[in-house]
Amino acid sequence: RLSKREANKINASPITELAIDSQPLQPGAVAYVLPWHDAKAPAVLQTLLEQGVNVRLTTAPFTGNDTLGNTLSFAPGAMVFNVGLNPHVPLFDVLNEALAQYPIKIHSLATGLTIEGIDLGSPSMLPLELPKVAILTGVGVSSNAVGAIWHYLDTRVGLPLTMLDKDRLADVDLSDFTHLIVVTGVYNDLDEKRQAQIESWLESGGTLIGQRMGLSWLSDMGWLQATVKSRNTVRNAVMFENMQYADRDIYRALQQVAGSVHLAQVDPTHPLLWGVTNNQTLPFFKTSSLLLQADDKPVIEAAKYTSFPLVAGYTAPEVNKLIGNTTALVAHRKGKGRVIAIVDPVNFRGYWRGTEKIMANAIFMSPAIN
């Protein structure tokens, strides 16, 4: 380790430009492929969808040859832009413009027939539409939670987020939106008419995304196949004998998870995790002691915490034990629609980058959740 004096003696130049190993497009390609692992991939996809590009979402792996004769393998989540499906779009020029804006690799394929896995014309290539996303706001809804999601979608993905005041929901045609996000807040003031409005939209094909305490309302409404455990579970766990009035601040503090890192076991084959990680574990940033338990149904749980999940920061041992083996991510069908539950603030303050793409996946990958 260098001392400050030794470090000052190092002759170095500032980095003013980041060199990216970009992949030039080949004009004779049959199709182009955008892998999903890059953090900028959602922004590129949003840009192309806004320009009317026909996009196919890969839901199974495949291997093919590029126009230079290289053999390339692609994981689920890769986006395919087929030249034949884009007769009204100058695809080559549009993709090059996107590459100029976002230095990222887009690969050129020589043929629609693959060496291994699905072909480009397979029904496992799902068509994607431009998402139209709204989030409930208003009295009783956490502005911090809304702001964190808005910041990610607006500044990093370039996806416009519509703010819907829940008190004016009756005046809104929800069919104008593909996704609706519900964050921490109070929603018991939504009357039966507005509840039925959301449920009808959901059953007809909408995607409902819940986060943190917004999940309590989704569970109470019977839309979420998971149960939010009572706050008394945490309160009782940290209660100690002979507690006095002077101990009340300690008692309250022990219940809090005010910003610590917890490790979850994840399913990297699940659409919510495509392009996020290839590992079996992923650290989540927790800011609450919310406990979610998914129903005992196959494949709806995309992530759950390890037995003793705390890896950084402080969480009372009793609460850490309670968090262990509870659910972090859930996704399932509801009629023709989908419900996605995200326990933690995956876009917390715009700096916890490891989980931020889960929000993008909840939007762009939702057609693959079956």
Across the structure, where does each feature detected by a protein language model lie?
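Intrinsic-disorder/low-complexity accessory segments
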Residues: 1-370
